[in-house]
Each structure stands twice: as structure tokens, then as C-alpha cells.
Curated annotation (Swiss-Prot):
It holds the Pfam family ELFV_dehydrog_N. It is an enzyme of class 1 (oxidoreductase). Its EC number is 1.4.1.9. The gene is ldh. Signal peptide: none annotated. This is Leucine dehydrogenase. It catalyses: L-leucine + NAD(+) + H2O = 4-methyl-2-oxopentanoate + NH4(+) + NADH + H(+). Pathway: Amino-acid degradation; L-leucine degradation; 4-methyl-2-oxopentanoate from L-leucine (dehydrogenase route): step 1/1. GO terms for biological process: L-leucine catabolic process. The active site is at K80. The keyword NAD applies. NAD(+) binds at G180, V181, G182, N183, V184, A185, Y186. Belongs to the Glu/Leu/Phe/Val dehydrogenases family. CDD domains: NAD_bind_Leu_Phe_Val_DH.
Length: 367
């Protein structure tokens, strides 16, 4: 990869390579854009096949966070960290302490949070070295587990998508096929069940499927069969890239709305489902509840305030649909356009994360 050429093409600001020989830390921090504020994005720990693969993942994820944070209406830019290693056996306290010192050295340009392969406990260790971390334990004034917040945002966005497709945002009696019944999807199923939706679920973990069947009266199907079931709404809540050449011909749903990241295998698949008349709620807009929740910590966490902001995902999805109609484009393109328009509006303004010469987090420290 020609790194500087790639950074210039996609407007990346900074890439930092971090290593600590004593702890075994090998990390890459990618900061894509800080026009709207400091870059916020989680720390992912994964056993990558190569350093180049890790770099590509960090860059891709950082850019995605710019769009997610902008579309969510947050005064935050986009960044991401990847730590190269097996989260099951390579973690140690010294590693996360060292990583926290690297974050502190960025002086607030990047704020981290948990992601795949990291936990709240890991964030607590990082917090010993830097204030620039969210998603720490509630006893430190944090929001705790972000899964319920993410699920509530998906639920709100799904209602907006239902209104677009069916003329009403009521989910009562609607058949929703949920792919994956992990932490986020479990809470989503609870919201859907309480409104009277009928659930079809699948997961490679039979225990979580059994729980959904018992608690929500869901119907269980084989993972390979979920795409072709008769349903009103398909909710991808597991792996990315599941809207692809193989799965699209099987789909019977009128709506796609779920919590999974990077649902479209390629952009052209968004074009295909658009031409089919399927209403697609873009993933990074509908699944922003978690990042909205942790971002509220920067102001001193207030659950009521955070949940009100998460409720607005309904409005954000409606805005995406309006832009799609206005410009005659697929919704995935409209989501990008909504985020880009907000960033461009602010590009010449003074960065909001410096207020009266002080970083936004100075308010949290003062409490």
C-alpha cells in the first residue's frame, strides 16, 4: 500500500503506529477526520494475518466512524484503533496501560472505546493512563454496556423504515427475520416482541436461539435458511457482507434494517436492492445508538439525554429517505451524502472540541 497516496485520496489526517516491546503491544491508530470534533472510535483486537491487513482494517473502520458520527449528529470525527493479537491469550494490563499512554500523547485528537476483542475492563485499564476513553465501568461515571442503546436505536430506525415501506411505523403483526441473536439482537428482539412483532431467528449459537424461542415465542431456522424466509423485515445483526450476489435472490423482505456493520458486500449490491424496491436502512445510521450513548459520557453521562438522542435515529433514517428521493439515489448513497453535507458545512468553522481554548473533556474532569 502507498500509504500517503491512500491517505490523500480518502482525506485521512493521521496514522500512528504504536509498539511496546515489554507488553507486546502492536497497535495502529487511524484518525480520518476531525472537522466536527475529536475522532471517536473503538479499539479492536484481532489476530490479523498481516500488518497490512491490520492497517487496511484500521483505515476502513476509521473512515466509517467519520460517517457514523456525522450522520448521528455528533460533534465528533472518526478514528479507530486495531491491536494486533489474540484477545483470548495476548491481553495483559501492561499492554493497555501502554496503549493508554499513546492515546494521552495525542492530547485529545482521538478518544477510544471498546470494540471487537476488547471489553469494559480493558477500557478501565486504559482509563488509568488517559481521560480520552469512553465505555468505562459505570462506577467511573460511564454508560456501561452499549448493547441496549444500540438495540433501541435499531428498533427506532426499523420503525422509520417500516413507515417508508408500509405506510405505518407500527411493527405489530409484522414478521421480522433476525439474523444473529447476540447482545444487541437480543435486546432488539425484546422491543419487537413487546410491540407485537412475530420473530424468526437464527444464530450459530444454539443457546441464544433457544432463549429467543422461549422468551419471545420466536421461530428458529437454520442459519442458511434465514435469507429466504417469508417475512416483512430482514434484520441482519451478525456478520457484515451478507447482502451479496448469493443472498439477494433469496430475499422476500420489503425492508432491510439491522445492527450489523458493513451489510452490503459491495456498493453495487445497494444499487441492486434499490432497483428491487427494497427499503434499506443504511447500517451506520441505524446502528449508531451505541456510539451516541458513549459520546454522551463526554458531557457527564445522563441516560435520559442519551436516550432522547438515540430516539432521533428515527428522524435520521427519515432524512436519508428524503435525500434518496430528492436526488433519486439509493439510500446507502443518501446516507453518505447526509454525512458529507454536514461535514462540509462545518469544515471552515473552528473545531467544536476546542471551546474557549479547552478540550471538550475538560468539563468531565471538572466534575
Amino acid at each position: 500500500m502507498e500509504l500517503f497516496k491512500y491517505m490523500e485520496t480518502y482525506d485521512y489526517e493521521q496514522v500512528l503506529f504504536c509498539q511496546d516491546k515489554e507488553s507486546g503491544l502492536k497497535a495502529i491508530i487511524a484518525i480520518h477526520d476531525t472537522t466536527l470534533g475529536p475522532a471517536l472510535g473503538g479499539t479492536r483486537m484481532w489476530m490479523y494475518n498481516s500488518e497490512e491487513e491490520a492497517l487496511e482494517d484500521a483505515l476502513r473502520l476509521a473512515r466509517g466512524m467519520t460517517y457514523k458520527n456525522a450522520a448521528a449528529g455528533l460533534n465528533l470525527g472518526g478514528g479507530k484503533t486495531v491491536i494486533i493479537g489474540d484477545p483470548r491469550k495476548d491481553k495483559n494490563e501492561a499492554m493497555f496501560r501502554a496503549f493508554g499512554r499513546f492515546i494521552q500523547g495525542l492530547n485529545g485528537r482521538y478518544i477510544t472505546a471498546e470494540d471487537v476483542g476488547t471489553t469494559v475492563a480493558d477500557m478501565d485499564i486504559i482509563y488509568q493512563e488517559t481521560d480520552y476513553v469512553t465505555g468505562i465501568s459505570p462506577e467511573f461515571g460511564s454508560s456501561g454496556n452499549p448493547s441496549p442503546a444500540t438495540a433501541y436505536g435499531v428498533y427506532r430506525g426499523m420503525k422509520a423504515a417500516a413507515k417508508e415501506a408500509f405506510g405505518s411505523d407500527s411493527l405489530e403483526g409484522k414478521v421480522v427475520a433476525v439474523q444473529g441473536v447476540g447482545n444487541v439482537a437480543y435486546h432488539l428482539c425484546r422491543h419487537l416482541h413487546e410491540e407485537g412483532a412475530k420473530l424468526i431467528v437464527t444464530d450459530i449459537n444454539k443457546e441464544v436461539v433457544a432463549r429467543a424461542v422461549e422468551e419471545f415465542g420466536a421461530k428458529a431456522v437454520d442459519p442458511n435458511d434465514i435469507y429466504g424466509v417469508e417475512c416483512d423485515i430482514f434484520a441482519p445483526c451478525a456478520l457484515g457482507g451478507i447482502i451479496n450476489d448469493q443472498t439477494i435472490p433469496q430475499l422476500k423482505a420489503k425492508v432491510i434494517a439491522g445492527s450489523a456493520d458493513n451489510q452490503l458486500k459491495e456498493p453495487r449490491h445497494g444499487d441492486i436492492i434499490h432497483e428491487m424496491g427494497i427499503v434499506y436502512a443504511p447500517d451506520y445510521v441505524i446502528n449508531a445508538g451505541g456510539v451516541i450513548n458513549v459520546a454522551d459520557e463526554l458531557y457527564g453521562y445522563n441516560r435520559e439525554r442519551a436516550m432522547k438522542k438515540i430516539e432521533q435515529i428515527y428522524d435520521n433514517i427519515e432524512k436519508v429517505f428524503a435525500i434518496a428521493k430528492r436526488d433519486n439515489i439509493p439510500t446507502y448513497v443518501a446516507a453518505d451524502r447526509m454525512a458529507e453535507e454536514r461535514i462540509e458545512t462545518m469544515r471552515k468553522a473552528r473545531s467544536p472540541f476546542l471551546q474557549n481554548g479547552h478540550h471538550i473533556l475538560s468539563r468531565r474532569r471538572a466534575r
